[in-house]
Amino acid sequence: MAKKGGWAAFPHDNAAFVYDGAALKKNWARLHKGDAEPFPSGDSAKAIEQAWRLYHAGDFEGAYEAGIKAGLDGYNVANKAACIYNNYLETSDANKQTAYAAVAARCEELQAAQQKNANAYYLAAYALGRYGQLIGVAKALAQGIGGKVSKALETALKLEPKHADAHIAFGTFNAEVIEKVGSMIGKMTYGVSKEAAVENYDKALKLNPESAVARTEMADGLYKLFGDKKMKDVEALYAEAAAFEPKDAMECLDVAAAKAEME
């Protein structure tokens, strides 16, 4: 896999993911059905549009750099590019931890400046959640990361109730905490439940029915919560995810991951 500036190149054909000119706005609603990100506006709109074009085409490093260069308004695209790249393409756990910590720090800065920016909270939760998975859920909970993730997701959903990706993340948060500490302690200490996990996954699928990652995350969550009793549902969700036609680089990575899991 070729490297550019330390970031691995996108490993798939991206010809179908190029949204030049007006194509970006025309396809925006479909491309952002998961994160409910508004189309760029303001003085830096053109630069941020270009950053999103790079992101959707799989140039995560280019998108990150362009987003950072655009200032606070570009932080969402920069942070999402960093999150997706590190989740799927970065191979070093140490690099991942550093990147997720940096995303969380930028999100705090953005939250202070733009208190109604839902993705400033969602991406903080995503980064902290992935960071917690890397260091271990038990250790993350002991460090108070669980509470930060929960609060960030609650805020994101309060600001944008139709944020499908935040519902996915909340479902996974509930499932992982219960898997680690059990239903009773999970509910008493962190306010999580199996019912809340399933409810959030279901909401995500209703809001974004063409989402592959909603299905794979739900499949993983169901297995964490119910084990082999839900294996038929788990397998069906993975099969559905693997059959999707991706519309951008992130979705391509989601579908590829689903296919790999089924092999």
Residues covered by each model-derived region:
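Glycine/small-residue-rich hydrophobic helix-like segments
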Residues: 199, 203-238
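Short amphipathic alpha-helical surface patches that mediate protein-protein
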Residues: 68, 172, 219-220, 239
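Secondary-structure boundary/capping motif
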Residues: 69, 118, 164, 203, ...
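Alpha-helical adaptor scaffolds
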Residues: 155, 159-209
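N-terminal alpha-helical interaction modules that lie
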Residues: 1-141, 146-160, 228-263
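TPR/Sel1-like alpha-solenoid repeat signature
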Residues: 121-124, 152, 167-170, 200, ...
